[in-house]
Amino acid sequence: MNDLLLKPDFQGKTPLIDFKVSGVLNIEGRSILENIIDHFQPAVDWINNLSTCPPPTITLNIKLEYFNTRSSKMILNILKSLEGMHLSKKSKVTVNWYYGDDDLDMLEAGNDYQSIIKLPFNMIS
């Protein structure tokens, strides 16, 4: 299995997705493309493949400035896949949710995910 690197588009409508087999997963930028599924699906598939032989620890760093409703569903899919690995004790998963000091919307979004996903979250401003 190889690392996954999905670069943002030149218009800044898709996020950087940089997933390392070592267990460090990064999602950064903005996610506002209407058909964002095409951008996120390789990441979901990659995580599902990783679950067959995961590293002992996985850290998901989410540093998004903004994301739309379609993106939120894809983020939830990623979190659910990681939750499965965590609950089955295949890997210890931690989510670091970054938000700007004055960005209460992103803080609320992180809290919403934290309330429905059984993973440890660190809210970092």
Could you describe each region identified by the protein language model?
Residues N2-L5, D9, N111-S125:
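A cross-taxonomic marker for long C-terminal extensions/tails that follow the last structured domain
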